[in-house]
Amino acid sequence: MTISTYRNEAESCVSLFNLLTQNGDTLFKPLTVSSFERLFLDPAICPAVFVGYEGDRLIAFGAGNCTGETGYITYIGVLPGYRRSGCGRMIAETLEAALADTHPEMKKIELVFYNPTELPWFIPGHAPHDHAGEPGVDMSTPAYPFFSSLGYRAWTVQNTYYLPLADYRCPDEMAGRLARLKENGIEITRYDRNIHHGFSELFDNIGNEGWRKRVMSRLDEDIVVAVRNGQVIGYTGPLSVSKEGRGLFCGIAVRTEYRHHGIGKALFAGLCAGLSEKGASFMSLFTGDNNPARYVYESAGFTIVRSFATMRKIIR
């Protein structure tokens, strides 16, 4: 195999990419030439793309990018008939060397959700429902041992959760949870600026300025809140549905002094119900295997559809 820098081979790269998607080797959504160029060649991400040829036939390509001290490998694909012959390794090592040479400040290469290139992929068994980007390396595929053999090491496992929302009903146990909260003066409802107070103070309490900026500018939208004596002590939302039918999850928080009482689980179930009412057909998200937030998602009925390893290789 001969490797060279990408030179306007978009159509051949797209054909390879889509073949591996259609035959089930990957979960990625098919690309067009336009989407390929937008995702892989955007100059803002300092792209590196290499192609591999056997004679005049393109049999492999790989893509990555770099931001500051971190490089990312986005994709490596090899035609089935040429696998296990070192082609993938050659592409990967060429990418690594190119990123290191052109970015002397780069210290590591990662396969992780921070990659600025997000390749959308289908939820297995639930297409056309999709997710915006893979949070790492799919542990159920040959990609995981492949990158392990190249010296990449896993440091976390990210589970992707999925829940259909078209006919969503809160789990039976949630009625009891809501009743217990109400006995303690806590209600799950929609935010009303005319009767509720303390929303900004919630973000003071949890110390998250990013969420404050995103939420406080959208108080006229539907936001699920937990309130006690009119004070906002927790929230999730705003309720928003994408054109594809995805229920969007923008964050969830509970004041520190009210945690460990099941308020987060009640808020999240209220979010799912509200998104369903607004026409959402599904929701997907990912979180770390050891993140306690997983129990909030599982309590609402979410199930794990794929597990991904975040992987890293120290370069210098």
Specify the residue positions occupied by each region the protein language model found.
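Short amphipathic alpha-helix that is part of the acyltransferase structural core
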Residues: 1-37, 51, 158, 173-210
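A conserved beta-strand-loop-helix scaffold within acyl/acetyltransferase catalytic domains
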Residues: 24-49, 54, 60-71, 75-76, ...
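A structural microfeature
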Residues: 60, 156-159, 234, 306
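Conserved hydrophobic beta-strand within the GNAT/NAT acetyltransferase core sheet
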Residues: 73, 108-111, 249, 283-287
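Conserved acetyl-CoA-binding loop-helix of GNAT-fold acetyltransferases
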Residues: 78, 84-99, 254, 260-277, ...
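Acyl-donor-binding surface of acyltransferase catalytic domains
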Residues: 93-182, 309-313
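Conserved active-site tyrosine of GNAT-family acetyltransferases
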Residues: 147, 297-298, 302
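Short glycine/proline-centered loop/turn elements that form peptide/ligand docking sites
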Residues: 268, 290-293, 314-315
